[in-house]
Structure formats: C-alpha cells, structure tokens
Amino acid sequence: MAVLKLCEQPPLVQAIFSGDPEEIRMLIHKTEDVNALDSEKRTPLHVAAFLGDAEIIELLILSGARVNAKDNMWLTPLHRAVASRSEEAVQVLIKHSADVNARDKNWQTPLHVAAANKAVKCAEVIIPLLSSVNVSDRGGRTALHHAALNGHMEMVNLLLAKGANINAFDKKDRRALHWAAYMGHLDVVALLINHGAEVTCKDKKGYTPLHAAASNGQISVVKHLLNLGVEIDEINVYGNTALHIACYNGQDAVVNELIDYGANVNQPNNSGFTPLHFAAASTHGALCLELLVNNGADVNIQSKDGKSPLHMTAVHGRFTRSQTLIQNGGEIDCVDKDGNTPLHVAARHGHELLINTLITSGADTAKCGIHSMFPLHLAALNAHSDCCRKLLSSGFEIDTPDTFGRTCLHAAAAGGNVECIKLLQSSGADFHKKDKCGRTPLHYAAANCHFHCIKALVTTGANVNETDDWGRTALHYAAASDMDRNKMILGNAHDNSEELERAREVKEKDAALCLEFLLQNDANPSIRDKEGYNSIHYAAAYGHRQCLELLLERTNTGFEESDGGALKSPLHLAAYNGHHQALEVLLQSLVDLDIRDEKGRTALYLAAFKGHTECVEALVNQGASIFVKDNVTKRTPLHASVINGHTLCLRLLLETADNPEVVDVKDAKGQTPLMLAVAYGHIDAVSLLLEKEANVDAVDIVGCTALHRGIMTGHEECVQMLLEQEASILCKDSRGRTPLHYAAARGHATWLNELLQIALSEEDCCLKDNQGYTPLHWACYNGNENCIEVLLEQKCFRKFIGNPFTPLHCAIINGHESCASLLLGAIDPSIVSCRDDKGRTTLHAAAFGDHAECLQLLLRHDAQVNAVDNSGKTALMMAAENGQAGAVDILVNSAQADLTVKDKDLNTPLHLAISKGHEKCALLILDKIQDESLINAKNSALQTPLHIAARNGLKVVVEELLAKGACVLAVDENASRSNGPRSPPGTAVRKEE
C-alpha cells in the first residue's frame, strides 16, 4: 500500500483531513467529485471513515458519496471506520445502508476487522445486524480467531456472549485457542478454556495448543496448560511432541519447564529423531541440548536412518554441542545406515572446527563410510581443502580405494579444488591409480572441467592419453563435459534464464580451456573409444563449439564417415541434439553433408525429426539434400519433421526444395508426408502441406488415402481440411473400404453424414467393400447407434444389400440390442428372417453369442424359433452346441423351441449339448423332455445321448438320462454299449452275434 503525500491530494481530501465541514460544503458546491478515486481506488468517504469523522461522513453521503464503495483491496468505508474504532462513524454509515456483510479481498467482514482492532463498541453496533458471528474469512478464520490472535480479552468476551463458536476451526483446523496459545495471551487462553474450548484440540498436522505455545516460547501458557493436565507427550502427525518443537525452535525456558513436568526426553518421532537430535541441529538449541543431556537424554540414540545427535551436530557444524555430547558419552565413531560416522558428515559439509574436535576426541579417520569412502574422500570430493589438511595429518594409507576403486585423489579431482590435489600429491598420492572403470584422477578432473586440477595432474606426469575401460581418454571427457547437467544443477539454486546462460558460457569456456591445455600437452584427438567415437564426436554431441574449433584445428582425422565402429558421425550427433553452433563449425569442414548413419539417416533427417529448426536451416542453407531416404522406412527429412509435428522445420524443407513434387514423396509403405501429418493429428503441418498442393488422393501400398487415415485416427480438423480440398470420399483401399466405411466403423456420425451427402450426389455410388459389407454393416457390427441413425435417413440403406450376413446379423452377433431395435423399427420387421450364406437367421446369431436381450427382441418380432440353417441346425442347436446356457434357457422355456428337430447328422439339441460337454445346457434340455423315444434318439452314428454322455464323463447327465429311461443296451455303429467297457485304444470292438 503506497503512502501518498497529503499536499498532492485533491482539495476535498485535504479538507476532510482538516476536519472543516464548511470548506467541504463549498467544494461540493463547486462540483468537486465526492466519489473521486485515488491511485488505490479510495474515495473521500474512505478518508472520512478512516478519520472517524461522523459529521463529514454524513455530509459526504448526503452529497452523493457511495456508502459501499470498495478500494482496490475491496475495503469499504465501514471497514475503515471499524479499523479506526469510531463508533459514531459506524452508526452513521449503517444508518445510510452500509453493508455489514461486505468482504474485502481476504473475505474479511467489518466484524473481522473490529475483532482484530479491539473495536468493541463498533462490534456491539454491527453484531445485531448479522445473521451469524461465525462467518469465516478466506483462511477460514472467524472473528473469534482474530480477537484471540490479537489478545483482545473484552472482544473475546463479547463474541462468546453473542454465540461465537468457541471450537470453530480455520482451513488448517486451528482453533482460537491455538492462536491465543501461540501468541502467549494467557488471559484469553484461560477465558477460552473456561468457556469450554477443547484444550487437547489438534490442527490438520496434529499440533495442539501446547505445541503452539512451546514453539513460540510462551512459558506462561505452557505452564497453564500443563497445570490443566494436558498430555505432555502428545504427538503431531510427524510424531513430534511439544519438547521436540521447543528444542527445534531453541526455546530453552520451555524445554526446562517441560522436563520438570516429566516430558519424555527420549521420545522418538516418526523418523526416529528425539528432542536431542533437534537440539543438536537447531540454530539456537545449545542450552536446550545442555538441559536434555543433564536430564538423562540418551546421547547415542539413533534415528531410523542411523543418525545420532552427534551426526546432527556434524551436519550443521555445532562443534560446542558436539563437545558436550562427547563429554557425556557420545559414541564418536557411531555409523548411520550409510556407514558414515560424524567425522564423515563433518568432512562432507566442511566443518573444520568440528573435525578438529572429533579427531582430538579419538575419531577414526580411516573408518570406511558410504561406498567404503574415508572422511578424506568426502572432504576432497566437496572441495574442502582445510578439512583435507586436518584429516591428512592423522595419517593412513592415502591410496586406499573405495567400493568403486576411487582413491582420495580421484575425489579431489572431481571436487575441483586444486589445493586438495596438491595436498594429496605432497602426501604421496599416486595419480596413476585407476578406479574399477579404469579411470585416473585426470579423467575425473577433465569430466568436470577443472582446469587447475588438470594442470596440476599433467604437470606432475599424468598420462594425457591414458584410456579407461571404454577406451576414453581425458580428452574425450573434457569434450563431453555436460553443460546441460551443470545448467540443471545451477537451476536448483537460481531461476534466472540469463544467469543460467551466463553460467553455461563460463562452463563452455572452462571446457575449452581444459581441452586446449590437454592438446598442448600432446593429447591425441584421433583416439577412438570402443564405440568408435573420438573427442570430436563427443564435443559435437554435447554442443561445445569452442572445443570443436580447437579439435578441428589440431586434427586431420576424417570424421565425415561413420568409420572406426562409430554408428553416427559428429554431424549426426550435433544435429540430433540440436547444437546448431557446433553444427555450423562442422559444416565449415565438411564436403559431404548427406553422410548416413547405420540406419541410413542423414543429419538433416535427425534434425528434422527432433524439430531443431536452427540445425535444419543451417543444413539446408549449406545444401543438404531433402530427398535422401533412410534404409529402413525409406523416409525423407520431410517425413521425419511431420511425424512429430515440427511445422517450422517442414516449412524450411519445403521452401528450399527445388522440385515441387517432393511434397508427395513416399516412404516404404507408400505414405506421403500428408498421410503422416493427418495420422498424427498435426493440424499446422496438414495446413502447410495442403498449401503446398500436396496430393490429397495419393494412396499408400494398401490403398489408403490421407482421408482414410484421418477418419481412422479421429482427427477432426485434419479431416475437415481434407474435405475442403475435395478429397475423394469414394476412394477404396485394398479391402474395398471407403472413408465412409471407416467413419461408420469408428462411430464418427457427423463426418458420416457429411460424407454421405457428397457420396450420394455422385454417380456410380458403390458402397460395398470387397466382402460385400456396406457402411451400415460396419456401424451395426461396432454398435454405433448415431451412425446407424444417419445411414437409415438415406433411402438406399433401408434395404439390405451386399453380404447376406446382414447389418441385423452384425448387430445381433455382438449383442448390440439397441442397434438391432433401430433396424427393426426403420425397416420391415420381416428382416428377422433374413439368412446369411450358410442359411443362418439372426436368431442363430443371437443364440451363438448368448445375447439374451437380442433373443427376446427377435422373438418379440416373430422370429422363427425352429428355422434351420444349411446344416439343419436350429437356433437352439446352435446355442446348445456352443454352451450358451442363457440362450438355451430362453429358447427352451420362453420360446418353446422344438426339441425333436434333428440336423443333417440326426443330432438333436440334446446330442449336441452333450457332445461338447456342456452339462448345464444338457440339463436344461433334459428338464423339458418326457418322451423316452427322444431320450433314446440315435444320430447317424447310432449314438444315443447316453453313449455320448458316458464317453464324455458327464456323470450328472448320465444319471438324469437313466432316470428318464435311457436304454443302457443300445449299440452304436461300433457296437459299443453306453455302459460297457471301453475298448483299448486302436482296437475295434467285435460285433456281438
């Protein structure tokens, strides 16, 4: 909120501050605007209310001032009057209809403001006009919260008397008692508790009033709560007690009081930290730690991650507290879950005084910690030279490796402090030592661009061409120094893009400096690693322009070819990673810009695929070909740019093409860039290709056009653009399907309608695919009701044409009852009797799929329940043979299907159910059979149902057949009886004479 100079304000505002009603009247009479706004949208009435001048307020309102005007914080004059505790001003404003429920931007009403500012008289005027005193602001706080927070005893009394909810909570579930306790308003705390406030209440994170008071050092409130008998060791959601909180905030007086009242000094929280851990770490916890130790706190207790209080002092460098812990029995070499002692932790964080204390007290400097590293490893890795000096003086085998074979010198080289390097070298560290990957300290220094470390190592004799297990030298690592990783690390601390870019430039220069020094000391830039890459490849891959320039000056290595086992050239690597500056350096030294990688892709292809516009521009400007196809998919850079929707790259490629036909170039599958753009839904790319007159009716190897693909993938805007270019909608693919078929199959009713209008206006409109299926077949098969409705609006679809497996069959076979109902309602109901080329009716289809609702629909439309197909089977037989018990139940019990019908092999429904082992279906049929002749009916193999049931081991069916009079002596064509012994496999049973 700005502070304005009174002398610069309008005369009316100055007169209000002067308190001169006569001058105000004169100014108003001179048409001074009574509703004029200042820079913060405050009116003269806001000023008068702020001053609490009732007479002037009255005068302004009678002169037309808006009583409920809001400033830019949404504060009304009533808010201002209440804040000034002016009862008279409040009464005048309310008399003139001031809104007592008005809210500011924090949703605070005048009552909130009154409560916060101890405006008791104002509150007494406002409250009778309110429906509730428990209205909450944006933070969920009521007027009682504000009164308690500010310690206004009289206001709290008034609000409680007027019905304020004493246990109302804000959005963090904090009560008025929490706020009063935190602020140390003992009289308010006592008053709230006396009126029934819940003394053990918790907020969302489990903090009680005791936690709140302890955190802010409110000793009197803490004593009062303890005297009331609250649970002293109550925990919050993190497992912290009031003692934890007091120690964390360095409230030693509260700590002393809690200990005197019996608080558990060794209570662990959810992470296993005790109050002593917090006291050891906190900024102001020294006295707290003394109190805890003197009252029996366990100095060696460990958290869940193994940290002792001594570890905590080591993290934060609290060396005085570390001495206290050690003097009271703290274990110096206690290890955490990573194996680190306090000395490791202190070394990592660079606390020299603490290291001195620990070593003096007997800490083991040669103890192995995380990854078997010494404290010296960690000090060197984090570039703490003074700590290294302290640790070196204790004496141990300096070249002892960690788990990964790294010595302290490796760590120092990675850390980048040359003083650490010199200290270790002067102590006899061997710079020839290799880690388990074969890397020397020089490799580490180069990888991190630590120039002075590289210089120190090379000067003392380090081999600049020493290779690691992957065949990489220090030059490889310097060339590959990851700027983006450094940028990311810097970004954790800074969020300024300019600053990050400057930092990147500094690192780039460091890398170039390191590289130049290595080259000056006979580093060989031609050495290739085991993947065939040399330092030029790495510099290109990581975009180090300066490094590339240096390397290209120093080497005659032919890097145009992907030789030496390398899969990609430097040009490919720079293009793929979008390093246009590095690319430009390479282009100056290259003759062939169209060299290929192992898959036949050029650098231009990779740049276009990744969408690196500047790289694409650099390549095409230098003459890179856009016609070169890869070896696998036969795609060009045009295809590559389209796949990921890189329209800028696509435009560059098209505008530099000499041959306009390039826009329709095809890949191995016959796909043009337009087809791919449509398939992937890249609208801008589609628009650009159409602008460049791409052929909308080009077909791929399966006959699909871009329109086919657009409808298949459902990209609406792409389809619309193709239709606007009059793309053929009757073009058939290799299966004879048009875009209409795909629209119907995919459920695109809107497109289908639009396509139909165009298709039906053309002559020779054939809408059958190679199998005779129409769009109606496909819509029905996939259950697309909206599409069916669109198609049935056209007269030509109200009769079934094409494949005799009709649209009704298609709907029924997949259980689309609503689609079938649409067809039956729009077309002659006699279509239920339509047969496919195998003579099967729609009822057969419903029975086959066990679709009960479809069966019932067809039966309601007089479907012939006993109609047989070409093999003599009824719908019941179809259901029985396929084990569709639901369909069998409906056909047998509701439709009363004929159980005596036989197929061409003389099988009854019962034979078929039993032959396939469908016990439930067989029992449903048996339940309706009373005729023994049907029970003993024989098929063409002279088998009765009993023969088949016995052979298939259907025990329950056999029992039911026998109960219904099945003949056990019946003989089939192999002379087998249903109850006789089975013949051995491969032998014939001799016929009885």
From Swiss-Prot:
InterPro entries named among the record's database cross-references: Ankyrin_rpt (IPR002110), Ankyrin_rpt-contain_sf (IPR036770)
ANK repeat coordinates: 7-36, 40-69, 73-102, 106-135, 139-168, 172-201, 205-234, 238-267, 271-301, 305-334, 338-367, 371-400, 404-433, 437-466, 470-498, 531-561, 566-595, 599-628, 633-662, 669-698, 702-731, 735-764, 771-800, 803-832, 838-867, 871-901, 905-934, 941-970
Record region (Disordered): 974-993
SUPFAM superfamilies with a match to the protein in the record: Ankyrin repeat
Matches recorded under Gene3D superfamilies: Ankyrin repeat-containing domain
SMART domains: ANK
PROSITE patterns referenced in this protein's UniProt entry, alphabetically: ANK_REP_REGION, ANK_REPEAT
Pfam families documented for this protein: Ank, Ank_2, Ank_4
UniProt keyword annotations, A-Z: ANK repeat, Repeat
Function: Putative regulatory subunit of protein phosphatase 6 (PP6) that may be involved in the recognition of phosphoprotein substrates.
Subunit structure comment from the entry: Protein phosphatase 6 (PP6) holoenzyme is proposed to be a heterotrimeric complex formed by the catalytic subunit, a SAPS domain-containing subunit (PP6R) and an ankyrin repeat-domain containing regulatory subunit (ARS). Interacts with PPP6R1.
Name assigned to this protein: Serine/threonine-protein phosphatase 6 regulatory ankyrin repeat subunit B
Organism: Mus musculus
Source organism phylogeny: Eukaryota, Metazoa, Chordata, Craniata, Vertebrata
